[in-house]
Amino acid sequence: AYFSGGKPYELFEASRGCPFDCSFCFIHQFRDMYRRKGKGLRLRTPQLVVDDIKETHRQHGIKQVMFVDSTFNLNKKWLMEFCELFAEQTDLIMTVNIRADIMDDEIMQALAKARCNPARFAIETGSEEMRNGILEKQLTNEQIQNTARLFKKYNVPFVTYNMMGMPN
């Protein structure tokens, strides 16, 4: 287990892959490299992930789970089931990486119920033109603002990823 602020936590991966093609990200390179080797996005079953978390908690006394998945909210049905199981079967806190343009009220409610603290999402830059042009992120300022409002509405803390030192 790792420690953050004196609290033990563990890193988990519930999924691998990402369908987006952001120019700066390595994940789509893996997808291209392994194109004929199976699915580009693979999800573990929600119950299996929760079972692994419970066993790690039993063995190491963790208090928090940090998911390293690129985009935890890619599959809404999966996320809803996982959050329900996590909330029912653990008393832990979780941290996830999400994409702002695929957030909605229902997903936010599920994350809040599952004690998500914090959620993380990438803005990359305040310039929408640079974000969507150079970085090929395809994410509008309005989508970012709407997601921030959802976090505030459900009182879920969030952290943003930002790049520094880009051209212009």
Language model feature labels by segment:
Residues 1-164:
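Radical SAM [4Fe-4S] cluster-binding motif and immediate context
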